[in-house]
């Protein structure tokens, strides 16, 4: 959104410059002809309006020629107070106006009237807040934070003000094609059935030495209070972690080349083929029931956790590793009859059968060969061999439109989404159950928020007390907690999550600085302390309380003491420039 605003402002400035070159501005909308004017009144022209952007109650000067008979100035349909007037300049006070757009500036018409004619010129009026309409509710938008958190990745915090249903919304926006950026689901403690706090997953996975897990959100719904089983399926590194309990659920899909998709996935029934005989498997990584054959891998735990009533066979791939959408050749390593709880060696799997299904395994011996296959089919894309998938529920946003999958209750919510060209990934958490701060949203409202951010496709993840967003070295006391679950700081342990990973080495050298606050809002005569982050070349925050920053501000706006700004001037808005060792950042200031 910040980039869109900058692009919009640049286009506006170019347009204003083109208008300033023009000698006159032609009359429009009912302006009377030059000929036959009453009392021989001379035509007047508007050359420019300066400054180019101001806010309500600021003074603006309309420059031109022949204003002697001008008696009224309107901004859209609202009359402005004239401070002074001459033949070539009219000074007016901008009237109070309501922003009607989802932007900090809105193009309005400035009309200067004389007794018999008027001239009109477009003007970009600056507003302290944009206005966003969510279904039938109008919200005042305030961007509280916007800063980098990793390769091609930014965190944005937005407050949507409303008397009855205020909202606090958190976004992580990521350039999928950014260098050194990977995406990966995380299983709680790397084992099915466990739970773990999202804010602990990032540091734990980073400590394993496979990149910096710098940002993520909670994942799938799970059997809370029971066995904590994931409900909608998950795969990691070409291994099935858990099969979905429903078909055609929404999935975040990560391909080997790093491409990401959101689509509804269907799983074929897993099967093994031995000696030309195909045997369907009843489950993967689930408790074995009577007359079943089940495959277990290391995500289930160290052993199969079975009794001694069946047959178990340890198998390993003959080449490479386990994979999805492929016939994976395997070799029997060892067999166990009437013995359970078999250990699952690294890189291997265990086939376990009871009752009528035992015969298939009883016929096997060490060295025997076979193949394993499970196919994942997407509804809208031709998938090759996905590396990771995270299943959730059906899509809430598809092709830029909310779907019929709706939960109408307002709750804290979590969402994952992609832009239409799949170049931008969005993680979102909306706080809820937070009195007077954030009421939560329905799934349709969540879909519309994702669409406003830029997503064309999105789904709803586990919400309520599970909704958690993490970003490395920022947030609450540097813990990475970006939102406030149920309005507090307690984070629920969850079964899995989805993370962005920076495939870079540690580097504490500061290459850029960023303000923790996107906008400073302060009352006249009052002060506001500023906080800055040190950002390395990969976009990661390496110092979350940077002190050696020099600040500069126009005296017309206020004064600086250390890292504190005081609104002592008459100017109502402007910027503070922060500089450190040749790198700088700017912070908006609004004086109320």
What are these regions (language model features)?
Residues 526-540, 576:
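Beta-strand-rich structural segments
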Residues 33-40, 126-348:
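Zymogen propeptides
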Residues 77-84, 552-564:
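Low-complexity "stalk/linker" and mucin-like segments enriched in Ser/Thr/Pro/Ala/Gly
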Residues 538-557:
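Short flexible loop/turn segments that cap and initiate beta-strands
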Residues 224-254, 387-420, 424-455, 466-511, ...:
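Conserved, well-ordered active-site substructure
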Residues 106-112, 571-580:
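A short beta-strand micro-motif common to beta-rich folds, especially ectodomain repeats
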Residues 31-135, 585, 589-591:
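Ser/Thr/Pro-rich low-complexity tracts
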Residues 92-97, 560-575:
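Extracellular/luminal low-complexity segments enriched in Ser/Thr/Pro
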């Amino acid at each position: 959104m910040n980039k869109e605003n900058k692009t919009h402002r640049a286009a506006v400035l170019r347009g204003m410059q083109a208008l300033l070159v023009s000698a006159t501005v032609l009359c429009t909308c009912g302006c009377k002809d030059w000929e036959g004017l009453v009392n021989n009144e001379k035509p007047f022209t508007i050359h420019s309006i300066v400054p180019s952007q101001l806010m309500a109650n600021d003074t603006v000067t309309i420059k031109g020629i022949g204003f002697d008979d001008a008696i009224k100035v309107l901004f859209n349909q609202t009359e402005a107070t004239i401070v002074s007037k001459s033949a070539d300049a009219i000074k007016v006070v901008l009237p109070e106006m309501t922003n009607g757009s989802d932007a900090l500036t809105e193009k309005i018409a400035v009309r200067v009237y004389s007794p018999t004619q008027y001239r009109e010129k477009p003007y970009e009026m600056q507003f302290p807040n944009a206005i966003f309409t969510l279904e039938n509710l109008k919200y005042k938008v305030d961007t509280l934070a916007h800063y980098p958190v990793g390769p091609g990745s930014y965190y944005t915090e937005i407050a949507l003000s409303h008397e009855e249903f205020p909202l606090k919304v958190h976004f992580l926006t990521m350039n999928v094609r950014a260098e050194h950026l990977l995406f990966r689901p995380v299983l709680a403690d790397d084992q099915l059935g466990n739970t773990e706090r999202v804010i602990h997953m990032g540091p734990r996975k980073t400590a394993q030495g496979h990149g910096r897990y710098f940002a993520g959100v909670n994942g799938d719904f799970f059997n809370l209070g029971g066995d904590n089983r994931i409900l909608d399926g998950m795969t990691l590194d070409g291994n099935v972690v858990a099969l979905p309990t429903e078909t055609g659920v929404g999935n975040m899909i990560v391909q080997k080349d790093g491409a990401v998709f959101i689509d509804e996935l269907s799983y074929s029934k897993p099967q093994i083929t031995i000696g030309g005989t195909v045997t369907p498997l009843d489950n993967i990584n689930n408790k074995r029931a009577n007359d079943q054959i089940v495959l277990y891998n290391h995500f289930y735990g160290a052993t199969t956790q079975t009794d001694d009533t069946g047959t178990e066979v340890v198998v390993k791939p003959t080449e490479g590793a386990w994979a999805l959408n492929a016939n994976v050749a395997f070799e029997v390593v060892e067999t166990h009859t009437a013995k359970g709880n078999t250990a699952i060696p690294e890189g291997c799997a265990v086939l376990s059968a009871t009752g009528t299904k035992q015969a298939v395994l009883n016929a096997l011996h060490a060295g025997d060969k076979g193949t394993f296959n499970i196919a994942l089919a997407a509804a809208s894309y031709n998938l090759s061999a996905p590396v990771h998938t995270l299943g959730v529920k059906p899509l809430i946003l598809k092709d830029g439109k909310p779907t019929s999958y709706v939960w109408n209750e307002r709750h804290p919510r979590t969402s994952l989404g992609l832009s239409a060209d799949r170049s931008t990934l969005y993680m979102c958490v909306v706080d809820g159950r937070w009195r007077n701060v954030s009421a939560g949203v329905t799934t349709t409202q969540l879909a519309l928020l994702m669409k406003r951010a830029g997503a064309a496709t999105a789904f709803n993840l586990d919400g309520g007390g599970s909704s958690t967003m993490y970003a490395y070295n920022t947030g609450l006391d540097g813990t990475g907690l970006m939102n406030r679950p149920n309005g507090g700081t307690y984070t629920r342990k969850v079964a899995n999550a989805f993370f962005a990973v920076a495939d870079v080495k540690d580097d504490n050298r500061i290459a850029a600085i960023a303000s923790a606050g996107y906008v400073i809002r302060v009352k006249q005569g009052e002060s506001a302390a500023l906080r800055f982050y040190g950002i390395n070349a990969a976009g990661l925050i390496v110092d979350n309380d940077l002190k050696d920053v020099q600040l500069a501000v126009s005296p017309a706006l206020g004064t600086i003491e250390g890292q504190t700004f005081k609104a002592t001037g008459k100017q109502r808005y402007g910027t503070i420039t922060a500089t450190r060792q040749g790198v700088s950042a700017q912070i908006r200031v609004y004086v109320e």
